[in-house]
């Protein structure tokens, strides 16, 4: 039996059946619901109608008629409105295509992942192809990737419009010829002025191709030539432009002393020079003059086997403003050469003496006494360095990065000296065979350490790595 409800409407029945209680339909249109017999809401509870909905007071909302409560259309309001009439709802794009959200989201993906995500839809591609997402990245294009093979067997140069849309300012071309470079210049819309850095690796570029490239691509200020054996020193004389500020030449068999003469005379604004050439001698370094002394701040002489202390003399007198110097692999440089560096290049912040087998602890004493601004020191494979040398380095309050890979005479006692270097952020001890677990465990005192490399260290045990994870939680330990 039913009883009258609100405003005389009949109240629906509420009868238990098979342990279920059927609730009356709600005016919100959600339909009936049921509660199982075992739930606290229905157990030992009399069958009651749902409580009437609580409505806001008249001062906060306009009263609704029975027609409105029943879901029917509202009649037009009579009298003055109690508040401003809301406008139509603002339509927002779906979250998956909301550019504001996507602009923040895509920062969390790597370059490779961005390339894949750009294929999802046009909206994602439009957002991802903004140059800000690709700043600092350099596309690497191999010769075979520059052409599409047509059905007839002919080759067609690929469309580079996608690279132009992303605003790439540098490219690395691998295995290309003079013709490939000309095609690249003709087909990339930003090649004339927009490209600032070019790298050619293992390519057959000739003197003529190098000259055409630098003449056509007027924006290039950073140039790298690696493994290019078909250009000669004459090509450097005919093509190098004064606008170039960074030059790297490595594994190019025709590069010798005369190439340095061309570089020193044609590049007055050169700020960074990296040279890896087995045939360069001390004579080449004599070509540097005070003209480069004002602009050049970085010099890397990599595996220049013929350079001796005499060449170092020319460097320190001609380039007094160097802040970064690498003599890596210059195997004829001795402690006397390092003394010249320490006494004359007081602005150095980075010094690389790796693979210099004649360097001893005495060289480290010169470094510690005179290079008070030094922040990075690389001593990999300096096999004559001992604990005594590390005791000299422990006085350097500015040193932040120290590399001692494969320094086979360093022992636990030397590590104790390093524990006083609170400024250290990066320490590499990879391949040091005499370090024990006990000696390495003391490194937990360097609480500011951010990176510790211990690959190929016999004393680096799983238990030690667990110990580091507990006591150096902010440090990346490379096993």
Curated annotation (Swiss-Prot):
Residues 47-60, 73-92 have a biased composition (Pro residues). This is F-box/LRR-repeat protein 16. Residues 94-139 form the F-box domain. PANTHER family: MITOCHONDRIAL ATP SYNTHASE COUPLING FACTOR B. GO terms for biological process: SCF-dependent proteasomal ubiquitin-dependent protein catabolic process. The keyword Repeat applies. SMART domains: LRR_CC. The modification Omega-N-methylarginine is found at residue 92. Keywords: Leucine-rich repeat, Methylation, Repeat, Ubl conjugation pathway. InterPro entries: F-box-like_dom_sf (IPR036047), F-box_LRR-repeat (IPR050648), Leu-rich_rpt (IPR001611), Leu-rich_rpt_Cys-con_subtyp (IPR006553), LRR_dom_sf (IPR032675). Residues 1-94 are annotated as: Disordered. It comes from Rattus norvegicus. LRR repeats lie at residues 244-266, 267-290, 319-343, 345-369, 371-395, 396-420, 446-470.
């Amino acid at each position: 039996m039913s009883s009258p409800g609100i405003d005389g409407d009949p109240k629906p029945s509420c009868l238990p059946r098979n342990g279920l209680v059927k609730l009356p339909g709600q005016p919100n249109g959600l339909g009936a619901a049921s509660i199982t017999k075992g739930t606290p809401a229905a157990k030992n509870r009399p069958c009651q109608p749902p409580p009437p909905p609580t409505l806001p007071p008249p001062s906060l909302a306009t009263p609704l008629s029975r027609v409105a409560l029943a879901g029917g259309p509202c009649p037009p309001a009579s009298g003055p409105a109690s508040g401003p009439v809301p406008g139509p709802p603002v339509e927002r794009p779906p979250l998956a295509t909301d550019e504001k959200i996507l602009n923040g989201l895509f920062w969390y993906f790597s370059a490779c992942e961005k390339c894949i995500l750009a294929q999802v839809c046009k909206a994602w591609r439009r957002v991802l192809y903004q140059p800000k997402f690709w700043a600092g990245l350099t596309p690497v294009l191999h010769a075979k990737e520059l052409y599409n093979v047509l059905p007839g067997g002919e080759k067609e140069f690929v469309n580079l419009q996608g690279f132009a849309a992303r605003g790439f300012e540098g490219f690395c071309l691998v295995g290309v010829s003079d013709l490939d470079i000309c095609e690249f210049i003709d087909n990339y819309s930003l090649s004339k002025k927009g490209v600032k850095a070019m790298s050619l690796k293992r390519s057959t570029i000739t003197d003529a191709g190098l000259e055409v490239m630098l003449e056509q691509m007027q924006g290039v200020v950073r140039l790298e030539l690696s493994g290019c054996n078909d250009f000669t020193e004459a090509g450097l004389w005919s093509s190098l432009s004064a606008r170039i500020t960074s030059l790297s030449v490595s594994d190019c068999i025709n590069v010798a002393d005369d190439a340095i003469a061309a570089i020193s005379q044609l590049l007055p604004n050169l700020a960074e020079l990296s040279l890896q050439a087995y045939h360069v001698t001390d004579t080449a370094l004599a070509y540097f003059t005070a003209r480069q002394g004002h602009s050049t701040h970085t010099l890397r002489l990599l595996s220049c086997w013929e350079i001796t202390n005499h060449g170092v003399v020319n460097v320190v007198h001609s380039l007094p403003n160097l802040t970064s110097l690498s003599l890596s692999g210059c195997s004829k440089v001795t402690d006397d050469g390092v003394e010249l560096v320490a006494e004359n290049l007081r602005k150095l912040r980075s010094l690389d003496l790796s693979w210099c087998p004649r360097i001893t602890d005495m060289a480290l004493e010169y470094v510690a006494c005179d290079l008070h601004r030094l922040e990075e020191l690389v001593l990999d494979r300096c096999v004559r360095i001992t604990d005594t040398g590390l005791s000299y380095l422990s006085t350097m309050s500015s040193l932040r990065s120290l590399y001692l890979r494969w320094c086979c005479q360093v022992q636990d006692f030397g590590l104790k000296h390093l524990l006083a270097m609170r400024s250290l952020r990066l320490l590499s001890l990879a391949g040091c065979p005499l370090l024990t677990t006990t000696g390495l465990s003391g490194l937990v005192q360097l609480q500011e350490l951010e990176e510790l490399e211990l690959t190929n260290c016999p004393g680096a045990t799983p238990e030690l790595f667990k110990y580091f994870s507990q006591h150096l939680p902010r440090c990346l330990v490379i096993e």
